[in-house]
Amino acid sequence: MWNSDWKKGEDYPAWGDTDVYKKTISGGYLVNGESPKDAYWRVAKTVAKRLYKPELAEKFFEYIWKGWLCLASPVLSNTGTDRGLPISCFGIDVADSIQDIGNKNLEMMLLAKHGGGVGIGINQIRAAGKRITGNGTSDGVVPFCKIYDSTILATNQGSVRRGAASVNINIEHDDFLDWVEIREPKGDVNRQSLNLHQCAVVGDKFMRRLEAGDQDARQRWAKLLQKRKATGEPYILFKGNTNKSNPEAYKKNSLKVHMTNICSEIVLHTDESHSFVCCLSSLNLDKYDEWKNTNLIYDATWFLDGVLEEFIQRAKNMKGFENSVRSAEKGRALGLGVLGWHSLLQKNGIAFEGLLAQFKTREIFSKIKIETERASRALAEVYGEPLWCSGTGFRNTHLRAVAPTVSNSKLSGNVSPGIEPWAANVFTEQSAKGTFIRKNNELKKVFRKVGIDTKEVWDKVLADGGSVQGIKQLDGWNYDNRGRLTQEDDGEAVKNVFKTFKEINQLELVRQAGIRQDYIDQSVSLNLAFPAEAPPRWLNQVHIEAWKRGIKTLYYTRTESVLRGDIAAAAMDPDCLSCDG
């Protein structure tokens, strides 16, 4: 609970002086009456100690205190405590045997018991009608999904987040068309898995069949897009794009990616004895101009390697974590990401659509790539190369991934989540952490400048679903090439800069994501948004373009029903606190 005696700038950062920050951070992130400042010190000291460099604690704290480095939910809530682990996102792969199906169910149960959200690969399980050992035939993947569904529902994870799991299957699996219906509350209840999320794994071979007009491929693809438009999922993992761009360490060890995690930004190897972990936190792009000439990215990579070591040392003797620890020790994969991308663009008067945003994408993500790799080489010199990195000069197989950051964006100054556009410029949000009225900070500055920061105008924006396109007082206002408001004719129109998710051309979103993917060795939680009346041909075009641009994963498809300003953020998946980097 928030302590009213805490002082701004002393017990919590000045930029956190908002109801959103206070309600969110006091909703499960603090322990034993500690203040936010105490929590930041707890994390910084613990991680520095794991690196055997206690002198780094002050530097880590300063990055967090300034709002430059934003901690993933489990990192903030659990690091340095005995109530949970600093990593709570995992991926497990199930082999085609009753023994492994049962073993992985137990593994998932034990991971979930300790706060884990779990991605499950079920593609190896034989399809319905296939012969099994002895007499009889298989019932396919659907009954086993029901087992996992019941397990995750029954496993309590405490107060920070509830149980969650996703199941991954290849679109060419013989059971795909049955599997894609398991979230529908109709038919045989024993074949329903209403609590599982879904991810379709799509290979290049299938996409080439689709382009060639193969009828079976077209039927499966159409069903996938139909479900994504109606329900938001299944997520998509483009397996070919992913494995073609695997890092040197994976190629040397013949490691492949078969699945993704519950938030679709992790693309790491899994097999019968290796389960991946998601070690995440984010750089705050809203404050990019403050930190771009500092050592933040380099030091944040050291920080995450320390977080991973904290996980390994605490989990190595815990039942159910053997496969996760084994994978973490051999690869030490990290996922340094970003949040506040749309906030940064708006702060600088840059429209999401267009060349300037593309240039900024290359500038920032190339810098992150260079600096994280420099840090990993330095880490390898100090601590050595793990098994899978042997001979590469790196400490980590992977370094970069962009998580959803829905909660983290509230704890970072009420900025935009991840690389995603704002769903609305104002909305009422109901979540597990409280109920808030959230207004776009940059738009509020514009309204003040123009002289329209009134309840009536904000009510109009809210009534219009969070859009400013109907605010006539903004007509004629532009940004010049230095990001300053002006009424001169030249420049970017304010209304373009403050377009919402659904108002932005989704092909431009995909093009920008394709540029970004070139610099990210894991993946990005990339949502798409379409109006309810969007024709199937348009969805098809955007999804195929994503594959062609080399994008590795697609997260949710948002339609009109989940993009209205009054429920925009409530529609964001609460399950992804596990990797809210």
Q: Where do the model's predicted regions map?
A:
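Conserved catalytic alpha/beta cores of large enzymes that bind or transform nucleotide phosphates
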Residues: 138-146, 153-227, 231-234, 302, ...
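Core structural elements
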Residues: 15-17, 63-79, 171, 303-314, ...
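Catalytic alpha/beta core of large soluble enzyme barrels
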Residues: 14, 257-271, 312-314, 400-568, ...
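Gly/Pro-rich turn-and-neighbor structural signature
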Residues: 36-42, 46-97, 210-212, 216-226, ...
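Internal maturation/activation junctions in enzymes
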Residues: 105, 299-325, 329, 348-405, ...
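Secondary-structure capping and boundary motifs in well-ordered enzyme cores
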Residues: 17, 35-36, 82-83, 94-97, ...
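Acidic/polar, glycine-rich intrinsically disordered N-terminal extensions of enzymes
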Residues: 1-86, 222, 548, 556-561, ...
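Active-site cavity-forming subdomains of large catalytic enzyme subunits
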Residues: 2-11, 16, 87-290, 321-325, ...
